[in-house]
Amino acid sequence: MLLLALPVFPFVGCEPRTDNGSSVEPISLYEKIGGVWNLSDMRQIDETAKAAGLSVTEVNLYAQFEFPSLVIDLTTEGNQPTTYQVSGTAPELFPNAGYWELNTPFPAADGTAPKILLFADAAKTAKIGELNIISVPGAVEAMELRLTRTADGVPFVSYIYKLVK
């Protein structure tokens, strides 16, 4: 009798469970990027000199001017972007307040860097700026943003913001 029951034991208590992720929302970039960020470094890159192959193309503005504070607050509500607010003593390079969203809520499969799009209105129809995310926060809560100024579509200066939570 015991020999007849042995082949059945491996199947008792087994319940087929497939973890396909359908019960959990995927982690979006909003979860990583939203929040209060403090400036830890700021560099200016002369894109014209860089394109011409000149040696002096980068200036560390943070060390040179010793900005006591710069805080960027990217507010989210229910994992959706709402407003942003910039405070501190660094020069204003983009509007200090408005609304924001990412050009994509998830990392791109082709490795394209996400962008923070800045808007003047809550409907997000009047775009007032764009920040390229060069370094997305992960295990280390640090992020790098690039703001590039152009003239007739040609970049002439970029600012790199290194931020920490």
Where do the model's predicted regions map?
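Lipid interaction determinants
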Residues: E15-P95, P105-K165
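Short beta-strand-centered aromatic/proline hotspots
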Residues: G98-E101
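Sec-dependent N-terminal signal peptides
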Residues: M1-P7
